[in-house]
Each structure stands twice: as C-alpha cells, then as structure tokens.
Amino acid sequence: RKYNLSPKKLSACVEHYNKMELSFVVHLGDFIDRDFASFDKVVPIYNQLKAPHYHVLGNHDFEVADDKKALVPAKLGLKHRYYDFARKGWRFIAIDGNDVSLYAWPKNDPRTKAAAEYHKSLKPRPPSWNGALGDEQLKWIEDKLQAATKAKERVMLFCHFPVYPKNSHNLWNAGALTELLSRYPCVAAYVNGHN
C-alpha cells in the first residue's frame, strides 16, 4: 500500500475527469486509510471536480479515533450518511453499508454493541470490517424504490460493499438487500467499491 501517492493520483484523476462532460462523479468509499488528517489532503483535490460529485462511506473512512468517527460524514460534505438524487429519469441511491458495523461508531456506543451481537449471530461469521444496512435504512430504500416506480424512474444504487457474488467481502445482510431490490423492476444497477 502506497497511500502517500494518493494525492498525486487523485489530482491526475480529477484533471482527467475535468476534461470530460460528466453528469456527476461518485467516489465509492475508503477515501482515507487510518488517519483523519488525511481528509484535509484529499477532499480539497476531489472538490476541484467540475461535475457534481458525491461520496459513499467506506470502512476505512472510519478507521479513525473514536472522537472523530461522528465527524467523518461532514468532512466528506455529507449531510446524511445515505441519500438520493435524480438526473434525467434516473434515481441514484447512495447507501451506507457501515450503518450496522463494529467500527463506524465509538466503542462504547450502543450501536457498536448491537452490531457485535448481530455479527456474532451470523453463520458463517463474516469479516468484522464489513457492515450491514439497518432496518430503518432498508425501509428508506424501499420507500425510494416505490417512489421511483411511481415516477417511472430507473434506479442505480451505490454502496461501498458488494452484494454479489456471495463472498466474504459482501455486505453482512446482502441477502436482505438483494431480495428487496429483486422485487423492483426499476432497479437497473448496483455499483460498489471495497474490492
């Protein structure tokens, strides 16, 4: 891993993208690795994009001190950890696969304890660095899919964690999400990072 090369690579990427006519750009997570101060190096570069640009939260984005975890979304310019936006007959849904996780909340946070109990219940037990969507977020996604269906919009989802094919890097509750998505013909694509 050569993370010290990231600012230079990101600058080259932004320069390349700025030569294109893009509708938008989505970064699929892991914007940093283990150092909250790294956001100050890469966020200003990313913000030089001419096209509208968005973030999805990755597991490495939360590998920071407990007192910094709550600051991560705002540092990336996010008002909400999951959100949606529309463009030309499409509904784009950015979801938070770190909603239920062992690392995205402080160690003494009740959400971390609940995530530990959930993780312990999974068989076979997936890696601790993955995460899941909470019930509230799953309901929110379904509401968005229903609204997209009614508006005759196609839907593309963005998440850090994959859901398919079945493997150890997937969202802990990939099955619940794929079952939900399969009920809505408006869903055209699911795009992930992580791997």
Region spans (language model):
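N-terminal active-site segment of His-dependent metallophosphoesterases
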Residues: 1-40, 136
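Alpha-helix N-cap and loop-to-helix initiation/capping positions
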Residues: 2-5, 129-133, 172
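Active-site neighborhood of phospho(di)ester-bond hydrolases with catalytic His/Asp-centered motifs
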Residues: 25-30, 53-59, 95, 156-159, ...
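Second-shell loop/turn segments in exported
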Residues: 29-32, 126-131, 165-166
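Extended active-site neighborhood of metal-dependent phosphoesterases/phosphodiesterases
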Residues: 37-151, 176-186
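Long, structured stretches of catalytic cores involved in phosphate-ester chemistry, encompassing
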Residues: 153, 163-195
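Short acidic, glycine-rich surface-loop motifs adjacent to enzyme active sites
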Residues: 145-165
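Short, well-ordered secondary-structure micro-motifs
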Residues: 22, 66-67, 105, 167-170
